[in-house]
């Protein structure tokens, strides 16, 4: 843990893009070297938290499920108090925390995290959602610290040109990095971890 407390990583993206899969993969990749905890956001359930518990991503006491109600982006941006309270609770429970992963509820391309809540942000999109997603931009996609283009293995089945998808992502993001990934099989996870260690100072 740094003098500023644990690194808080916000993970956002539309429903079904692979946020929970990324969270699970990051837990598995980081937990042997760092003290890790997770906060998940769901609108009316704690389904994502329960999934991570069943998957044994982390010990149960290191996972917090937040039920946001209403619009999920409000709880990570306009009024992040419910998530900030969960961060404070985890820090009180685990004095040695290095990393807190904060997974947002599924939202649209405009969703972003309050800088008060997240030090670094990852935005996940789904190749199967269509060729034009990067061209639609939106703050979450264009301004997150890292974009993860997930489910690239499905591209041949959904008529998506990966080279064009990469080109459009580069145009939308400028110099900001992105990773082509297939998180279910683990492809791209090492690149994401390397980014977090480098940019997050782990």
Curated annotation (Swiss-Prot):
UniProt family annotation: Belongs to the SIMIBI class G3E GTPase family. UreG subfamily.
Primary location: cytoplasm
Its biological purpose: Facilitates the functional incorporation of the urease nickel metallocenter. This process requires GTP hydrolysis, probably effectuated by UreG.
Domain of life: Bacteria
Protein name (database record): Urease accessory protein UreG
Listed GO biological process terms: urea catabolic process
Pfam annotation, one family: cobW
Keyword terms, alphabetized: Chaperone, Cytoplasm, GTP-binding, Nickel insertion, Nucleotide-binding
Gene name per UniProt: ureG
PANTHER family listed in its UniProt record: UREASE ACCESSORY PROTEIN G
């Amino acid at each position: 843990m740094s003098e500023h407390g644990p690194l808080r990583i916000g993970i956002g993206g539309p429903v079904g893009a692979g946020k929970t899969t990324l969270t699970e993969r990051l837990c598995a990749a980081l937990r042997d070297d760092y003290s890790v905890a997770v906060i998940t956001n769901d609108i009316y359930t704690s389904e994502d938290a329960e999934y991570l518990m069943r998957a044994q991503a982390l010990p149960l006491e290191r996972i917090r499920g937040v039920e946001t109600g209403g619009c999920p982006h409000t709880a990570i941006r306009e009024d992040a108090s419910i998530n900030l309270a969960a961060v404070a609770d985890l820090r009180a429970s685990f004095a040695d925390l290095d990393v807190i992963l904060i997974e947002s509820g599924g939202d649209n391309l405009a969703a972003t995290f309050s800088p008060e809540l997240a030090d670094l942000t990852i935005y996940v999109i789904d190749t199967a959602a269509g060729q034009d997603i990067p061209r639609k931009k939106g703050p979450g996609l264009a301004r997150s610290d890292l974009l993860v283009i997930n489910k690239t293995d499905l591209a041949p089945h959904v008529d998506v040109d990966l080279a064009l998808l990469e080109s459009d992502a580069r145009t939308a993001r400028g110099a900001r990095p992105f990773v082509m990934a297939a998180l279910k099989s683990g492809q791209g996870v090492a690149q994401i971890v390397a980014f977090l260690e480098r940019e997050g100072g782990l």
